[in-house]
Amino acid sequence: MLLIAKYVIPVTSPYIEDGAVLVRDDKILDLGPASQLKDKYPEEEIRDFGLSVLMPGFVDVHTHLGYTALRGMFGDLPYAEWKRQVLHTEPFFTEEDWLDSARIGALEAVASGITTIADISASGVSRIPASEMGLRARVYYEVLTAQKEHAADAVRAGVEKIEQWKDECGSDLLDFGLAPGPVYGCHPSVFQAIADVAIERGIPVAMHLAGSQEEADFIRYGSSPFGVHVSEHEQGKLASAYPPWLPAGTSPVSYVSNWGILDVPGILAIHCVQVDDRDIGILREKDVHIGYCPRINAKLGMGSAPLEKFWTAGLTIGLGTDSPAAVDTTDMIDEMRIGLMITRATSSERFVRASAKNALRMATIGSARALGIEDKVGSLEPGKQADIIAIDLHNSHQNPTTDPESAVIYTANQDNVKMTMVAGRILYDDFVHVSGCDRDAIVDRARALRVRIREEVSDEALRRSLIEHASEDKQDRYNR
């Protein structure tokens, strides 16, 4: 099939006006000016997308699709309180609820032009809708324990779980890895145990790192905004007032580096907001890959990752949408635009590398490199997998444009994605899902889930409030 559009953006080479991409089976065979490829391949079926951009699909290096149903429930909260509210809600979810939530997230990812996701959870639920809908995915199993004596068993169980998922999935589009739980909720021996097994077996590893001031203070001083009284469900996921080990007196990056996990080849460190120049030096020395998630960092007041410094240090950087429970959408175009603008507003070298071209690279080939799959995806090149999207520019305020990369970043959004192809298979075409999934049923189930969860969370919040007030009244009577 010959895909034709006004602009073809290979990402790793200059864009082609009036360009074409030849796809056969699951691979890209050729690309170039449309007139030349039509003459060269006269028997090929032609799909002409007109005033559109053809480009590699977005590679989302960090998401939590299982939380999609929670979006809009906890708005305008700082990170620590948002985290607590989300964790309070988790017990209300059944296994089927998590699946319904992940399905609506995967459905929207496809419609947003995302062709590869990297998802972290303890359930691995995202692997199911990814497989159902034809997405490329890496699913990390989250290993979480605050108890040193449980660390080895927890990591061993994680390895067994991802081996089980591999056996069950039966798809070349899915692979699996390990992810330690939050630095503030995980015993450090977990980091060492994961590093040992990952290096030995070549298992991909990702971790949240230096994402908030709360995390930085907890590691350095042992302080925590979450308080002493945490529920059984929250144990391990939230830090109590004092860690079960001595405060490290150093930064999160230095702390985890001392426990060996940054020695895992190609480890993906997500966020890296609370970092200084020494930390960046460690990240560079260890060749740590960065997962940049500007929207959630800004919305939850976590800070802003020093993107320009990462670029200057030569770090590999990919882009992630993170939790839909915070950012509401899986819009990688919005993620690029906001990240670019935040960097220009906060960096002393505003326009050295913070360009539309580099933002587009970060969301495609940069993200592919961050996951170690740049040999397969991330750019339009002969021999690579045919993970391709078409973005409609008819409504672009830059139309007619002399810079299609700028038009995508500054005037498009996820609603302008008109076609999504993964491994040569079209999943979304002319703004309609064609992968065989029942879109209406998925949406209806997600809506019903949101209504039920909202009601149950509201009832639980009222119950907790009554208990807290009763406790305060009892204390007042005692004081009198």
Predicted segment positions?
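His/Asp/Glu-enriched, well-ordered alpha-helical/loop segment
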Residues: V228, N258-L262, E308-N395, T411-A412
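Active-site microenvironment of metallo-dependent hydrolases
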Residues: M1-G19, R24-L29, K40, L209, ...
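Histidine-centered catalytic micro-motifs
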Residues: G57-T68, P204-Q213
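Alpha-helical scaffold segments that flank or form the walls of functional sites
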Residues: V53, R71-L135, R156-G170, R447-V451, ...
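Active-site metal-binding motif and surrounding structural segment of the metallo-beta-lactamase
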Residues: Q36-M55
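Active-site beta-loop-alpha junctions enriched in small/polar residues
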Residues: H64, A122-S123, E142-A146, A179-V183, ...
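Active-site gating loops and adjacent loop-to-helix segments of metal-dependent hydrolytic enzymes
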Residues: A69-D100, R138-L144, Q213-V264, I338-A354
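Histidine/acidic residue-rich metal-binding segments in metalloenzymes
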Residues: I128-P129, V155-H289, G301-I317, D375
